[in-house]
Amino acid sequence: MKISYNWLKDYLECDLSPEAVAEALTSIGLEVDALEQVEEIPGGLAGVIVAEVVECEDHPDSDHLHVTKLNTGEPELLQVVCGAPNVAAGQKVLLATVGTVLGADFKIKKSKIRGVESFGMICAEDELGIGESHDGIMVLEPEAVVGTPAKDYLGLATDAIIEIGLTANRVDAASHIGVARDLYAYLKHNDIPCRLNIPDVSAFAEGEGEAIPVEVTAVDGAPRYTGTTIRGVKIAASPEWLQKKLLAIGLRPINNVVDITNFVLHEIGQPLHAFDAAKIKGGKVVVRRAAEGEKFVTLDGVERTLSAADLMIANAEESMCLAGVFGGEDSGVTESTVDVFLESAYFNPVSVRKTSKRHGLKTDASFRYERGADPLAVEYAARRASLLIQEIAGGTVVGKVQESYPEKIVKKTVDLDYDRIENFVGKKIGHDVIEEILGSLAYEFVEKREGGAVVAVPSYMIDVYRECDVVEEILRIYGYNNIELPSAMRMSVNAPQKPEPEQVRKSISDFLAANGFVETMNNSLTRSEYYSKLKTFPEAKCVRIMNPLSSDLNVMRQTLILNGLEVIAYNINRQITNIKTFEYGSVYSFDPETDGKTLASYEEHTCFALFMSGQPDKSWRVDPGKGSYFQLKGYLELLLKRFGCDIYSLETAAAPADLFSEGLSYALPGSHQPLAVMGTVAPARLKQFGIKQPVFAAEISWPALFELVRRNKIKYKELPKFPEVRRDLAILLDESVCYADLRKSAFRVGKKLLKQVGLFDVYRGDKIAEGKKQYALSFVLQDLDKTMTDNDVERVMSKLLSTFQNEFGAVLR
């Protein structure tokens, strides 16, 4: 946002230089991105001076040129050839000396014109850029002092443009008065002489006659709406002072009425809109929602299709303006306008934001409305603009100001405890200093008591709700640099946690990256509609954002899975179909059974999530096959195994059906603490994101995983000296028997001799009865003390088969 230094000083009298102002603004949280010195005329007419024509004779080889000699204040006269018809001896003129650059690139050089040398140029108004006349040279007053720089003689203004990187919560500073208010508080606190001048609008008066009425049918979109009717205006170019102010901040002057609305916008921060009253059909203004599919042509000449959610300013027959965003092509002020309807309103920030985003329109008005304009500045801005219109464009206010304001907006109040504020600040700054700073920031003291107060927050400070917000305001003005660091730090030293969480996390990330997974980082904010149909993560448990910038980012995520599906959908839409990703991040939830006023109502913890979808590219050597549920389970098993954890030792249950069509959830044995959930993502969730290929996902609770890692201490063993023996076993089982149960029983029976169990084939079909299946199992046996004999092996295998027969009804094949 651009602020003109000269314009700023209209409201704040102080002796600070532009550089000092920029430094002060940065210190109070309005970070200055750039400071640019500008001149009324580019270059400041450097090299142009006042000179006196001492001699003027006709050119010997021309019927219209003159050879002049000028006194420039130097001992010798300067010869210049001039073609102006009005040049004469005795005149005081403006001379561009050799080396001067006029305009963009017109450089004055020593030249020879028809055989006569010339050492400069006597200038006309248009050549200097101060007018449009080229009828002759510019003749100055006789009192002009020879040698005076043109910049000083003409009184050309210099200015400094301060560019502020405004954060989303500081819309109160999106104007010259807004910046002046903040700067005033800073200067006053630091005992720097200053005075705040807010333009007086007490001269505004309503008139006689009948004003254009206002009807608001969408009060939720326009909580406050006013309209002022001004008749008999004369549309013309704005006065020079107004044009200069707008040009200084990069705005193009249009006409006096439109320029006044832009001026007030950047002066106060309140957007205004001027309508040609003659184009308001039916003689009334209606604030309503658009009809679904309604067509509307905006000022840029583009026909737009409206949504039923768009708020419109209309007349009795048709729409005239996208409320708070952009005007219509046929309703604006033109040269033929005589009567004006001036709108000043407070529009719902969410409504404006959605309309602005939906139609891809970003304007100065929408910038302020969607961040939250000052609802109590509506009347002041209307009066200020009306007085300026009457002063500059003429006309009179007709009738009463029309207003729709069904529910009065009151200032927020905050209860303050001064001792608690000083604890927040980290320094005893004094109760009187707290009150002095708040007073300079225009806080009103509703109630004062010993050690505290109740204050009314200025209506333009839309981000201040709580005591901690007020503390931030106090700190901005007091100065973070004035909070000294203590000479000694008191802290308890804790032994580092073993194993260190960050090392475990890095080890997991390295493992996944080595196996082809790509790490992603998603926004913790997401949209609430993702949770509207979930039972596992119900929408009621979402932590909601108080002032969301967008409905797409209005809650904190409860799970990483939905964000991961967003990433997969994004990549698939860009022809990337083979996807393996993982993410480490926080998830949040809220207990809807509580009042939400304490931290106990909220929960935050971190998770790992893995995602697989698609099929890797084939090579001439190998067909990798499609990703599958079991492939993802294998990665999870290997991941846990790295930290000495056996996935088969965990408690298992079915994965939640609203997230997975098939899958398992795991919990720590004994404590039942949830560890992970994994499986094939349910079709309903895939449809939600427009994904048409299978997706396999897992979400792992970081606290539970770290607890598992902490429990299972890794032990190092000597490499075995004696060989392994492998045996296979094919058995017929009921469909209800699962491999995990067989595996547990096998290790219970095999004890120290059984090293590995594997399932290498599952068969159903011909010669297998319905409800039955055949498992082909492999067993790896090893004795660490000796080489196993055939008898040793057969003894173990017999025990295994007997166990399977007794516990699971297995039949040897």
Predicted regions and their residues:
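Phosphate-backbone binding interfaces of nucleic-acid-interacting proteins
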Residues: 1-205, 341, 360, 364, ...
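A carboxyl-terminal module marker
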Residues: 2, 439-446, 467, 522, ...
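Glycine/proline-enriched, intrinsically flexible loops and inter-domain linkers
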Residues: 5, 23, 28, 40, ...
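Beta-rich nucleic-acid/ligand-interaction surfaces
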Residues: 40-44, 203-205, 264, 456, ...
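Conserved mixed alpha/beta core segments that line enzyme active sites in large multi-domain catalysts
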Residues: 49-81, 147, 243, 255, ...
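Mobile "lid/hinge" segments at catalytic clefts and subdomain interfaces of large enzymes
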Residues: 114-129, 133-139, 150-160, 164, ...
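Terminal amphipathic helices with adjacent charged low-complexity linkers/tails
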Residues: 183, 187-217, 393-421, 428, ...
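Extended, well-folded interaction surfaces typified by the phenylalanyl-tRNA synthetase beta subunit core
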Residues: 414-582, 727, 780-784, 792-813
